[in-house]
Amino acid sequence: MTTAVERFLKYVSYDTQSDEAYDTCPSTEKQLLLANELKRELEEMGASDVRMSEYGYLFACIPDNTDSTSAPQEAEASFSTASAHGASDVGQKATIPALGFISHIDTAPSLTGTNVKPRIVQAYDGKDIVLNAEKQIVMKVSEFPFLADLKGQDLIVTDGTTLLGADDKAGVAEIMTMAEYFL
């Protein structure tokens, strides 16, 4: 199974920078390159009903993997809507509510997404992070005090010359890894 980190590092290599000059969805064709890769991955995993809209929205289904007739008693409470859908008899399969996960793939137009150079800072030491020594780009703890809370964690950073796209592409990597797990 591919890890979320492996997926994330792959996905950040796709330039999905948006362009505010266009009132289209997606605002750039290059966003479709990653969307098509995600579609291919979902199909390869065995997701059902994998489809992309004319606007680049990607959808897929993961079939339920529960058999409510053999679910433990405690689980029945968590599916409180099951009896409302007519599955109150013992031995009848309950209707389990669907759950959706959403993420976007476009990155901000303010900084390029081309030639992203991610790097993993292992066991972050709590000090300033030199993103790019040559260009003197440093992520200073004094400017980003939340970094103190991340001491000891592995961090994925860029070299400071591009966006990493971490908000969206990390979400996509997590969703895809979860999908693979359940499929």
Regions of interest found by a model, annotated:
Residues 1-4, 27-31, 35, 168-171:
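Generic structural signal for well-ordered, non-membrane alpha-helical segments
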Residues 2-29, 157:
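N-terminal capping segment at the start of a domain
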Residues 7-10, 37-40, 174-177, 181:
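Alpha-helical scaffold segments in soluble metabolic enzymes
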Residues 10-17, 43-47, 180-183:
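Generic secondary-structure signature for well-ordered alpha-helical cores
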Residues 18-19, 67, 106-110:
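Short, acidic Gly/Pro/Ser/Thr-rich loop/turn segments
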Residues 23-67, 95-96, 100-102:
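A non-catalytic alpha/beta surface segment that caps or lines the substrate-entry region
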Residues 66-95:
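Intrinsically disordered, low-complexity terminal tails and inter-domain linkers enriched
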Residues 95-174, 178-183:
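Active-site metal-coordination/substrate-binding segment of hydrolases
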